[in-house]
């Protein structure tokens, strides 16, 4: 298949989970969550966001996302179940592709960070999608460069699981609204507020539990 005129190899989810993470992260810009937040704050102060599109719309999205992340940083709480599971998993690296203007990333990254904080065996690395399209194009969602996209790998670089760009219940809602030609942005963010970060945590429990065996 092609994206923006470039040939892209698309793998099924099953194929991805049988593969090694073959990309070298050396020489790439990796952010911790706190470094990512600081970078976005500095960018907005200077009238910029991440990515090539520096339009007023993208700047506005980024400003709103900073507000969302600030809110989640203060209010998000992990469930007892996800805390217990995360505490028991072996060493993993979580690589998250994102951009500052992405609304779904603002709703989910703070929760991913809180989960990673529970266990020092988890190394969370945040990378910008548009600077790492070679990685992004190996982990498409339904053929698209949807973000955030998390790739979990073990210490032998085997891909353990992928997640993103949003919890499945919200993904299905977005799919339906797109098919009906509706504007899903306001609806999806209301869903996030009502969900209180429960769905993403439940999905991570289901993804991580098999890795404990």
Give a label for each model feature.
Residues 147-162:
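A short, hydrophobic beta-strand/beta-hairpin element that forms part of a small beta-sheet core
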Residues 130-132, 157, 168:
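Short acidic/polar capping segments at secondary-structure boundaries
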Residues 109, 113-116, 147-151:
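Short, well-ordered alpha-helical packing segments
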Residues 87, 113-120, 141-144:
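Short, surface-exposed basic-aromatic patches at helix termini and helix-loop junctions that form
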Residues 87-114:
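Local sequence-structure signature of Cys/Sec-based thiol-disulfide redox active-site neighborhoods
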Residues 5-7, 11-92, 137-143, 160-213:
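Non-globular targeting/processing and membrane-anchoring segments
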Residues 95-98, 121-135, 146:
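Thiol-based oxidoreductase modules, predominantly thioredoxin-like and allied folds used
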């Amino acid at each position: 298949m092609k994206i923006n005129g470039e040939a892209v190899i698309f793998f099924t989810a099953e194929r991805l989970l049988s593969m090694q993470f073959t990309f070298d992260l050396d020489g790439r810009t990796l952010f911790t969550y706190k470094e990512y937040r600081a970078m976005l704050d500095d960018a907005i102060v200077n009238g910029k966001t991440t990515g090539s599109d520096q339009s007023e719309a993208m700047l506005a999205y980024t400003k709103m996302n900073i507000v969302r992340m600030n809110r989640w940083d203060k209010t998000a709480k992990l469930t007892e179940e996800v805390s217990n599971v995360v505490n028991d998993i072996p060493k993993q690296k979580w690589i998250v592709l994102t951009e500052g203007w992405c609304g779904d990333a603002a709703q989910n990254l703070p929760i991913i960070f809180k989960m990673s904080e529970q266990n020092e065996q988890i190394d969370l690395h945040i990378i910008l999608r548009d600077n790492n399209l070679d990685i992004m194009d190996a982990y498409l969602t339904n053929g698209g460069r949807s973000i955030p996209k998390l790739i979990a790998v073990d210490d032998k670089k085997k891909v353990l699981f992928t997640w993103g760009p949003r919890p499945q219940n919200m993904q299905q809602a977005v799919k339906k609204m797109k098919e009906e030609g509706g504007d899903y942005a306001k609806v999806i963010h209301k869903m996030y507020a009502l969900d209180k970060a429960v769905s993403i945590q439940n999905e991570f429990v289901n993804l991580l539990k098999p890795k404990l065996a």
